[in-house]
Amino acid sequence: MKPLEVSEIEYVDVIVVGGGIAGVAIAEFLSRHSNLSIKLLEKAPQLGTLASGKLEGWYHTGALYSGQDDAQTFINCVNGVEDLINLYTPYFTEQCNINLTEKESNFFTPAIIPNPKGWFNDGPVYLIHPQADAPEISSSRLKSDAIQINIQRNRVLGRLEVAYGKQHNWLVNNKCLAPTYAQVENYEGLDSSLKDSTETIRNLCRQFDSSYDMEKSNYNFIKTLDCSMHTSRILRDLVTSCLSHGVTFETGIKIDKLLMDRYGPIRLKSLLCKTKEGRSKRLKAKLFIFAVGEGFEPFLNDLQVRAKLKRSRSAMVLTYPALVDTNFVRMSTKNRFHFNHFVQQREMGNEKYIYSLLADSGYANDDSNDGVDIEPILESAERYFGQEKLYSRQLYSYECVKTEFISQEEQKRRYSYWIESNSDSNYLCVLPGKFSFFPTVAYQAYQRIKTLLHFEELTPKSSFQSNMNIEIEANKLVAESYPMQIFLSN
């Protein structure tokens, strides 16, 4: 007897396509504030397997972008901190360990609250900013390089001081409120209350200078709010919250076709899919949300998305054990001198892994046949840590493919999410951005969803509560971070 040729049909209020941080965060926030039935689809066997699981886990609060000509990306990071504290800290009380603290009497700024089970590690990123006597500037024959490094330094000091120093009180009417773009850009002071360093940082810079046969040069050291974050833990907690609010997940499912209604305003009627068992499935919903990076290109025309996608590859070098216990980034005007070191800690059963992730600002277009060159990362690491210390450890390298959107109006790299919808349609597209911006993209997508779908808004419980069965299910759904997968396979 022939097997039956049959297609399962399923209907829910909202379908979210994409199991990275954006899709999971949107599903979680929507489920927390509504009684809508929500289903999330992911083509991979687990959630968080692509860019969301491969990055170094850098929580960006603006430091890396504080020296750019345009302050918009810096402000996006600062606003992300506001959204995190207002929307997640009160709900995930035991997990989201960033909150306002009283730096001086009645003056509040954001800070990491030490918590071994928290999302954010209590280890700041120290920003190393070179000056005119640094190797990359003193070896240059261009006078403009010395001018440029000073301009960048002034931007960095001023912007970070306004955001996180002694210029802005974040507590306004019992809510967290970030400084405005105008506040940041209008500040002209050069003093910084954030200047700080450690002996480890100073020794590393001394060793770096020495590798160029130079005497110790002058640096501005800044203790930033940036830190390393536990990306897989964040995903697991968000998924646990989703499950507790009735969200269903289907992994290993592939979308074959979007069935569009093109008579009048374009609307999406169904998704025609293949399940991981190879069965046909038709999925229908009141609203479809696409929060997909890799593999989304074939659907751009059908959905009439205006932004273009571009994939780029960057390299990571993993070292075990960790090289030092301090996070730092060298922020130069010369790309080849960019370098960052992050220390991460993970536990697997009774085993504890403390490892370093090394990276720089290098990336290659995904259409290039050549892999990303990791030699510049290794060369910089040799200068900071020494060959013996570096190569006596277990070393691995891997590539991370990042899908980013490029606005057709302005051909440059973007780091924020792009949310696109049509008020007459029934779908929403969220194009990729930084993991750190997940609170903002979840909230902004929610605001857009309210214009497309009528539903009763709910006030969420005072705080997140889980149970063991849901946590076990969430652990199965979310992939381990890529570095941990490397350790487990070697």
Regions found by a protein language model. Give the residues of each.
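A short, basic/flexible loop-to-alpha-helix module at the beginning of a structural domain
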Residues: 1-11
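Helical element adjacent to the flavin cofactor pocket in flavoenzyme catalytic cores
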Residues: 215-287, 438-448
